[in-house]
């Protein structure tokens, strides 16, 4: 059953509060939108905390970003939302924020593409990293274009995370999944490095999508993650004896003036 516009507005307000309470945005960060119909987008305004919005603060604009309704100014990153809607007819909501751990990976230039968690593989595949683009300009979206058709969550280099889905809550839950995945990945790295699932197991997880009601556009989509076999192919094993290792360390220390 379809909701009223007032209910969709309240969904954005409620999710705005959630991302603020979780610490995924600070001050006026972030933006959320919802596709009302074929010609109208409901979106957050600029210059306001996403945890302190009211329904009347939201803006209605057309598919060119022109304001149709609202007393405030629409988000400066509306072009990113519109591009996603244009490229993905199945998407009805887009959420952008700066969840700290996921954004830390983006700042470090690290995509979240390893096949580690069944829930992430089934629901998202993996999370790629888009090239940096100046916020509020077309360059922001340019680096995302190769990923939008295949992925439902994209890390934005030195910026944050964008997620999208069939409604506001689905976009929010995907963002929550990515941040949770980033935290687990970070802990695994601190504990000696994550153990990546092999291709066969990842294939089984992709095959199980239908059972869990996850939509997939093509086999092994969205976003095939990096499997154990990929990692092994990238490894270059270096073997040293104890004496060779000591000599190598001594040489490095002498070059830095630590030893004479």
Where are these regions (language model features)?
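Glycine-rich flexible loops
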Residues: 1-260
């Amino acid at each position: 059953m379809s909701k009223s516009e007032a209910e969709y507005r309240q969904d954005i307000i409620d999710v705005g509060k959630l991302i603020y309470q979780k610490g995924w945005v600070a001050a006026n960060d972030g933006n959320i939108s919802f596709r009302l119909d074929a010609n109208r987008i409901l979106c957050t305004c600029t210059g306001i905390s996403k945890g302190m919005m009211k329904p009347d603060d939201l803006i209605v604009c057309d598919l060119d970003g022109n304001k149709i309704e609202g007393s405030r100014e629409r988000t400066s990153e509306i072009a990113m939302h519109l591009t996603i809607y244009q490229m993905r007819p199945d998407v009805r909501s887009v959420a952008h924020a700066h969840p700290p751990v996921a954004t830390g990976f983006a700042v470090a230039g690290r995509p979240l593409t390893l096949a580690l968690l069944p829930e992430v593989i089934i629901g998202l595949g993996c999370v790629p990293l888009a090239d940096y683009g100046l916020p509020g300009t077309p360059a922001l979206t340019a680096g995302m274009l190769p990923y939008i058709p295949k992925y439902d969550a994209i890390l934005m280099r030195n910026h944050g995370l964008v997620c999208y889905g069939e409604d506001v809550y689905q976009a929010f839950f995907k963002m929550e999944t990515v941040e949770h995945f980033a935290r687990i990945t970070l802990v695994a790295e601190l504990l000696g490095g994550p153990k990546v699932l092999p291709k066969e197991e990842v294939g089984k997880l992709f095959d199980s999508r239908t059972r869990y009601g996850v939509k997939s556009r093509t086999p092994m989509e969205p976003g095939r993650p990096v499997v154990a076999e990929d990692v092994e192919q990238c490894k270059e094993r270096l073997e040293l004896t104890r004496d060779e290792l000591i000599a190598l360390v001594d040489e490095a220390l002498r070059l830095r003036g630590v030893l004479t």
